[in-house]
Protein backbone atom coordinates (compact mmCIF):
# COMPACT_ATOMS: atom_id res chain seq x y z
CA UNK A 1 0.00 0.00 0.00
CA UNK A 2 1.28 3.46 -0.89
CA UNK A 3 2.33 5.78 1.91
CA UNK A 4 0.56 8.52 -0.07
CA UNK A 5 -3.21 8.97 -0.09
CA UNK A 6 -5.55 11.78 -1.12
CA UNK A 7 -7.98 14.05 0.71
CA UNK A 8 -10.79 15.43 -1.45
CA UNK A 9 -12.59 18.60 -0.39
CA UNK A 10 -15.63 19.81 -2.32
CA UNK A 11 -17.22 18.21 -5.38
CA UNK A 12 -15.46 17.58 -8.68
CA UNK A 13 -16.50 20.05 -11.41
CA UNK A 14 -17.01 22.87 -8.90
CA UNK A 15 -14.90 25.85 -7.87
CA UNK A 16 -14.64 24.37 -4.36
CA UNK A 17 -12.95 21.13 -5.43
CA UNK A 18 -9.49 20.53 -3.97
CA UNK A 19 -7.35 17.40 -3.72
CA UNK A 20 -4.63 17.32 -1.08
CA UNK A 21 -1.90 14.69 -0.99
CA UNK A 22 -1.42 13.02 2.38
CA UNK A 23 1.54 11.08 3.72
CA UNK A 24 0.57 8.56 6.38
CA UNK A 25 -2.71 10.45 6.79
CA UNK A 26 -1.20 13.93 7.21
CA UNK A 27 -1.65 16.60 4.49
CA UNK A 28 1.59 17.61 2.77
CA UNK A 29 2.53 19.88 -0.11
CA UNK A 30 2.06 18.14 -3.45
CA UNK A 31 4.75 20.41 -4.87
CA UNK A 32 7.36 20.57 -2.12
CA UNK A 33 7.09 17.61 0.26
CA UNK A 34 7.13 14.63 -2.11
CA UNK A 35 10.71 13.68 -3.05
CA UNK A 36 11.40 13.92 -6.77
CA UNK A 37 13.56 10.80 -6.71
CA UNK A 38 12.06 7.58 -5.35
CA UNK A 39 15.34 5.65 -5.14
CA UNK A 40 18.94 6.46 -4.28
CA UNK A 41 20.13 5.78 -7.82
CA UNK A 42 17.74 8.47 -9.13
CA UNK A 43 16.41 6.10 -11.79
CA UNK A 44 12.86 6.00 -10.40
CA UNK A 45 10.95 9.24 -9.89
CA UNK A 46 7.74 10.25 -8.17
CA UNK A 47 5.09 12.00 -10.24
CA UNK A 48 1.80 13.49 -9.09
CA UNK A 49 -1.16 12.68 -11.32
CA UNK A 50 -3.28 15.78 -11.89
CA UNK A 51 -5.48 14.69 -14.82
CA UNK A 52 -6.39 11.02 -15.36
CA UNK A 53 -6.29 9.76 -18.94
CA UNK A 54 -9.43 10.39 -21.04
CA UNK A 55 -10.72 13.14 -18.75
CA UNK A 56 -11.07 16.84 -19.62
CA UNK A 57 -11.09 18.91 -16.42
CA UNK A 58 -7.91 21.04 -16.36
CA UNK A 59 -6.77 20.11 -12.88
CA UNK A 60 -3.38 21.31 -11.67
CA UNK A 61 -1.22 21.77 -8.62
CA UNK A 62 -2.07 25.20 -7.25
CA UNK A 63 1.17 27.08 -6.69
CA UNK A 64 -0.57 29.85 -4.75
CA UNK A 65 -2.50 27.85 -2.11
CA UNK A 66 -1.15 26.51 1.17
CA UNK A 67 0.18 22.95 0.69
CA UNK A 68 -0.50 23.33 -3.04
CA UNK A 69 -3.68 21.26 -3.46
CA UNK A 70 -4.81 20.22 -6.94
CA UNK A 71 -7.66 22.40 -8.20
CA UNK A 72 -9.44 22.94 -11.49
CA UNK A 73 -8.10 25.88 -13.44
CA UNK A 74 -10.46 28.76 -14.18
CA UNK A 75 -10.77 31.55 -16.71
CA UNK A 76 -12.97 34.56 -15.97
CA UNK A 77 -14.45 32.66 -13.05
CA UNK A 78 -15.44 29.61 -15.10
CA UNK A 79 -13.99 26.13 -14.84
CA UNK A 80 -11.71 25.13 -17.70
CA UNK A 81 -11.94 21.89 -19.67
CA UNK A 82 -9.68 20.76 -22.48
CA UNK A 83 -11.51 20.34 -25.79
CA UNK A 84 -11.84 17.02 -27.58
CA UNK A 85 -9.88 17.31 -30.83
CA UNK A 86 -10.80 14.38 -33.08
CA UNK A 87 -9.78 11.56 -32.77
CA UNK A 88 -8.62 12.25 -29.21
CA UNK A 89 -10.80 12.31 -26.11
CA UNK A 90 -9.54 14.42 -23.24
CA UNK A 91 -5.93 13.91 -22.23
CA UNK A 92 -4.42 10.85 -23.91
CA UNK A 93 -2.09 9.95 -21.03
CA UNK A 94 -2.12 10.31 -17.27
CA UNK A 95 -1.01 13.94 -17.08
CA UNK A 96 0.69 15.44 -14.08
CA UNK A 97 3.83 17.00 -12.67
CA UNK A 98 7.12 16.17 -11.04
CA UNK A 99 7.25 17.42 -7.43
CA UNK A 100 10.27 19.45 -6.36
CA UNK A 101 10.76 20.88 -9.87
CA UNK A 102 10.40 24.39 -11.26
CA UNK A 103 10.75 25.78 -14.77
CA UNK A 104 12.58 28.98 -13.90
CA UNK A 105 11.27 32.06 -15.78
CA UNK A 106 14.58 33.80 -15.08
CA UNK A 107 16.53 31.27 -17.15
CA UNK A 108 16.55 31.15 -20.96
CA UNK A 109 17.31 27.63 -22.14
CA UNK A 110 20.32 27.68 -24.50
CA UNK A 111 18.68 25.38 -27.07
CA UNK A 112 15.00 26.37 -26.97
CA UNK A 113 15.95 30.08 -26.69
CA UNK A 114 12.96 30.59 -24.38
CA UNK A 115 12.54 31.08 -20.63
CA UNK A 116 10.79 28.66 -18.29
CA UNK A 117 7.04 28.84 -17.75
CA UNK A 118 7.17 29.21 -13.94
CA UNK A 119 5.47 25.85 -13.30
CA UNK A 120 6.47 22.44 -12.01
CA UNK A 121 7.69 20.15 -14.79
CA UNK A 122 4.85 18.55 -16.79
CA UNK A 123 4.71 14.77 -17.17
CA UNK A 124 2.85 12.42 -19.55
CA UNK A 125 2.61 8.90 -18.12
CA UNK A 126 1.92 6.45 -20.94
CA UNK A 127 1.17 3.21 -19.08
CA UNK A 128 -2.02 1.21 -19.47
CA UNK A 129 -3.56 1.90 -16.03
CA UNK A 130 -5.68 5.03 -15.59
CA UNK A 131 -4.47 7.06 -12.67
CA UNK A 132 -6.48 9.26 -10.31
CA UNK A 133 -6.07 12.87 -9.26
CA UNK A 134 -3.50 13.16 -6.48
CA UNK A 135 -2.01 9.72 -7.09
CA UNK A 136 1.75 9.50 -6.57
CA UNK A 137 3.16 7.16 -9.22
CA UNK A 138 6.67 5.78 -9.40
CA UNK A 139 7.88 6.23 -12.98
CA UNK A 140 10.95 6.08 -15.16
CA UNK A 141 11.89 8.77 -17.66
CA UNK A 142 11.91 7.91 -21.38
CA UNK A 143 12.15 11.22 -23.24
CA UNK A 144 11.01 14.84 -23.45
CA UNK A 145 9.36 17.25 -25.88
CA UNK A 146 9.86 21.01 -25.76
CA UNK A 147 6.58 22.81 -26.37
CA UNK A 148 6.92 26.54 -26.99
CA UNK A 149 3.85 27.97 -25.32
CA UNK A 150 3.31 31.70 -25.84
CA UNK A 151 7.05 32.35 -25.86
CA UNK A 152 7.95 30.10 -22.95
CA UNK A 153 9.60 26.68 -22.77
CA UNK A 154 7.06 24.14 -21.54
CA UNK A 155 8.77 20.76 -21.28
CA UNK A 156 6.64 17.60 -21.53
CA UNK A 157 8.46 14.62 -20.04
CA UNK A 158 7.42 11.18 -21.31
CA UNK A 159 7.45 8.52 -18.58
CA UNK A 160 6.02 5.11 -17.76
CA UNK A 161 4.81 3.68 -14.46
CA UNK A 162 7.46 1.22 -13.25
CA UNK A 163 4.67 -1.28 -12.49
CA UNK A 164 3.33 -1.27 -16.06
CA UNK A 165 3.71 -4.57 -17.96
CA UNK A 166 5.64 -2.76 -20.70
CA UNK A 167 8.00 -0.94 -18.34
CA UNK A 168 10.82 -3.54 -18.55
CA UNK A 169 10.87 -3.13 -22.33
CA UNK A 170 10.83 0.67 -22.36
CA UNK A 171 14.18 2.23 -21.49
CA UNK A 172 14.49 5.09 -24.00
CA UNK A 173 12.32 7.00 -26.43
CA UNK A 174 12.97 4.72 -29.41
CA UNK A 175 11.51 1.83 -27.38
CA UNK A 176 8.22 3.73 -27.18
CA UNK A 177 7.91 3.83 -30.96
CA UNK A 178 8.83 0.16 -31.17
CA UNK A 179 6.29 -1.08 -28.62
CA UNK A 180 3.67 1.69 -28.77
CA UNK A 181 3.73 2.77 -32.43
CA UNK A 182 1.97 6.06 -33.12
CA UNK A 183 1.92 7.34 -29.54
CA UNK A 184 4.74 9.86 -29.89
CA UNK A 185 3.21 11.18 -33.12
CA UNK A 186 -0.20 11.45 -31.46
CA UNK A 187 1.36 13.22 -28.48
CA UNK A 188 2.99 15.78 -30.76
CA UNK A 189 -0.30 16.35 -32.56
CA UNK A 190 -2.28 16.64 -29.32
CA UNK A 191 -0.08 19.42 -27.96
CA UNK A 192 0.08 21.15 -31.33
CA UNK A 193 -3.69 21.48 -31.82
CA UNK A 194 -5.38 21.37 -28.42
CA UNK A 195 -5.82 25.14 -28.09
CA UNK A 196 -7.25 25.67 -31.58
CA UNK A 197 -10.92 25.11 -30.58
CA UNK A 198 -10.55 28.00 -28.10
CA UNK A 199 -9.52 30.37 -30.89
CA UNK A 200 -5.77 30.22 -30.32
CA UNK A 201 -3.14 29.35 -32.93
CA UNK A 202 -1.52 25.95 -32.97
CA UNK A 203 1.46 25.50 -30.68
CA UNK A 204 5.00 25.12 -31.93
CA UNK A 205 7.90 23.04 -30.68
CA UNK A 206 11.62 23.36 -30.30
CA UNK A 207 13.72 20.75 -32.09
CA UNK A 208 11.12 20.62 -34.92
CA UNK A 209 8.87 18.60 -32.62
CA UNK A 210 11.44 15.87 -32.02
CA UNK A 211 11.11 13.95 -28.78
CA UNK A 212 14.57 14.00 -27.20
CA UNK A 213 15.98 10.87 -25.58
CA UNK A 214 16.13 9.73 -21.98
CA UNK A 215 19.56 11.19 -21.28
CA UNK A 216 18.46 14.61 -22.48
CA UNK A 217 15.22 14.35 -20.50
CA UNK A 218 17.01 13.38 -17.30
CA UNK A 219 19.19 16.47 -17.64
CA UNK A 220 16.09 18.66 -18.01
CA UNK A 221 14.63 17.08 -14.87
CA UNK A 222 17.88 17.65 -12.95
CA UNK A 223 18.02 21.31 -14.00
CA UNK A 224 14.40 21.88 -12.95
CA UNK A 225 15.04 20.17 -9.61
CA UNK A 226 17.97 22.50 -9.01
CA UNK A 227 15.77 25.47 -9.94
CA UNK A 228 13.21 24.32 -7.35
CA UNK A 229 15.96 24.04 -4.72
CA UNK A 230 16.92 27.65 -5.41
CA UNK A 231 13.27 28.64 -5.10
CA UNK A 232 12.48 26.79 -1.87
CA UNK A 233 15.65 28.03 -0.13
CA UNK A 234 15.09 31.66 -1.13
CA UNK A 235 18.02 31.91 -3.54
CA UNK A 236 15.55 32.69 -6.34
CA UNK A 237 12.79 35.24 -5.77
CA UNK A 238 9.41 33.54 -5.88
CA UNK A 239 6.42 35.26 -7.37
CA UNK A 240 4.67 37.09 -4.55
CA UNK A 241 1.64 34.79 -4.61
CA UNK A 242 3.52 31.47 -4.59
CA UNK A 243 3.07 29.30 -1.51
CA UNK A 244 6.35 27.68 -0.50
CA UNK A 245 4.85 26.34 2.74
CA UNK A 246 5.87 22.75 3.41
CA UNK A 247 6.09 20.31 6.31
CA UNK A 248 9.40 18.55 5.66
CA UNK A 249 11.96 20.46 3.56
CA UNK A 250 15.07 21.21 5.60
CA UNK A 251 16.56 24.63 4.87
CA UNK A 252 13.45 25.96 3.17
CA UNK A 253 12.12 29.45 3.74
CA UNK A 254 8.63 28.32 4.78
CA UNK A 255 8.78 25.05 6.73
CA UNK A 256 5.73 24.79 9.01
CA UNK A 257 4.58 21.29 10.06
CA UNK A 258 1.68 22.77 12.06
CA UNK A 259 -0.09 23.88 8.88
CA UNK A 260 -1.35 20.34 8.19
CA UNK A 261 -3.89 20.70 10.99
CA UNK A 262 -5.53 23.68 9.24
CA UNK A 263 -6.56 21.70 6.14
CA UNK A 264 -10.32 20.98 5.90
CA UNK A 265 -11.53 17.41 6.50
CA UNK A 266 -12.29 15.09 3.60
CA UNK A 267 -15.72 15.21 1.99
CA UNK A 268 -17.28 12.43 -0.08
CA UNK A 269 -19.37 14.35 -2.59
CA UNK A 270 -20.68 13.28 -5.98
CA UNK A 271 -19.24 15.13 -8.99
CA UNK A 272 -21.32 18.08 -10.17
CA UNK A 273 -22.82 17.81 -13.67
CA UNK A 274 -21.00 19.53 -16.53
CA UNK A 275 -22.42 21.34 -19.52
CA UNK A 276 -22.92 18.85 -22.39
CA UNK A 277 -20.94 21.15 -24.69
CA UNK A 278 -17.80 20.04 -22.83
CA UNK A 279 -18.03 16.69 -24.62
CA UNK A 280 -18.20 18.10 -28.15
CA UNK A 281 -15.70 16.78 -30.69
CA UNK A 282 -13.77 19.35 -32.73
CA UNK A 283 -12.44 18.49 -36.17
CA UNK A 284 -9.19 20.31 -36.87
CA UNK A 285 -8.16 20.86 -40.49
CA UNK A 286 -4.73 19.60 -41.40
CA UNK A 287 -4.19 17.35 -38.39
CA UNK A 288 -4.17 13.82 -39.79
CA UNK A 289 -2.74 11.10 -37.60
Swiss-Prot record:
Residues that bind Mg(2+) 1: 117, 122, 154
UniProt binding sites for Mg(2+) 2: 122
Ranges annotated as spanning the membrane: none
Localization terms from the record: Cytoplasm
This protein's record includes keyword Metal-binding: yes
Reaction(s) catalysed by this chain's protein: diphosphate + H2O = 2 phosphate + H(+)
Annotated diphosphate binding sites: 80
The keyword Metal-binding belongs to this UniProt entry's keyword annotation: yes
Molecular-function annotations in GO: inorganic diphosphate phosphatase activity; magnesium ion binding
Uppermost EC category: hydrolase
GO cellular component, one term: nucleus
EC number(s) stated in the UniProt entry for this protein: 3.6.1.1
Cofactor(s) the record lists: Mg(2+)
Gene3D superfamilies: Inorganic pyrophosphatase
Source taxon at top rank: Eukaryota
One BP term from GO: phosphate-containing compound metabolic process
Keywords on record: Cytoplasm, Hydrolase, Magnesium, Metal-binding
Main location as per UniProt: cytoplasm
Quaternary assembly: Homodimer.
PANTHER family the UniProt entry points to: INORGANIC PYROPHOSPHATASE
UniProt similarity note: Belongs to the PPase family.
Protein name per Swiss-Prot or TrEMBL: Inorganic pyrophosphatase
Native source organism of the sequence: Schizosaccharomyces pombe (strain 972 / ATCC 24843)
Amino acid sequence: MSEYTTREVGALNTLDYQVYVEKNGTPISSWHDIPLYANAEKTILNMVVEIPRWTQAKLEITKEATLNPIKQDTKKGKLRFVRNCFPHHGYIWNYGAFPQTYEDPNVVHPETKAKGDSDPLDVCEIGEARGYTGQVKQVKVLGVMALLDEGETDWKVIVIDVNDPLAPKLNDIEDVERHMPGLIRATNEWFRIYKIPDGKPENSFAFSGECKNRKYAEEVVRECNEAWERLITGKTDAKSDFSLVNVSVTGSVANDPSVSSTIPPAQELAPAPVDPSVHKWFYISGSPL
